[in-house]
Amino acid sequence: MAQQRRGGRRRRKVDFIAANHIDYIDYKDVDLLKRFISERGKILPRRVTGTSAKNQRKLTVAIKRARVMGLLPFVAED
């Protein structure tokens, strides 16, 4: 027997960066970047955060730069 899917329509996620009119994603803005990494230190995917592809690429570059500069950890401490 085929099972029926439950639940209604999911609300579309809003791009936080576009909604707040952030033009430049600075690698030194650690508070902004922490919104887009998990508690383990991994970069969250677009389907979780709702960012556009363009802003996701900018975020990824900024997070990686912040990691190299020592502002963000590569992995979280246990």
Curated annotation (Swiss-Prot):
PROSITE patterns: RIBOSOMAL_S18. One of its GO terms (biological process) is translation. Disulfide bonds: none annotated. The keyword rRNA-binding applies. SUPFAM superfamilies: Ribosomal protein S18 (SSF46911). The keyword Ribosomal protein applies. One of its GO terms (cellular component) is cytosolic small ribosomal subunit. GO terms for molecular function: small ribosomal subunit rRNA binding; structural constituent of ribosome. Keywords: Ribonucleoprotein, Ribosomal protein, RNA-binding, rRNA-binding. Pfam families: Ribosomal_S18. InterPro entries: Ribosomal_bS18, Ribosomal_bS18_CS, Ribosomal_bS18_sf. Binds as a heterodimer with protein bS6 to the central domain of the 16S rRNA, where it helps stabilize the platform of the 30S subunit. Part of the 30S ribosomal subunit. Forms a tight heterodimer with protein bS6. HAMAP family: Ribosomal_bS18. NCBIfam families: S18 (TIGR00165). Belongs to the bacterial ribosomal protein bS18 family. This is Small ribosomal subunit protein bS18. The gene is rpsR.
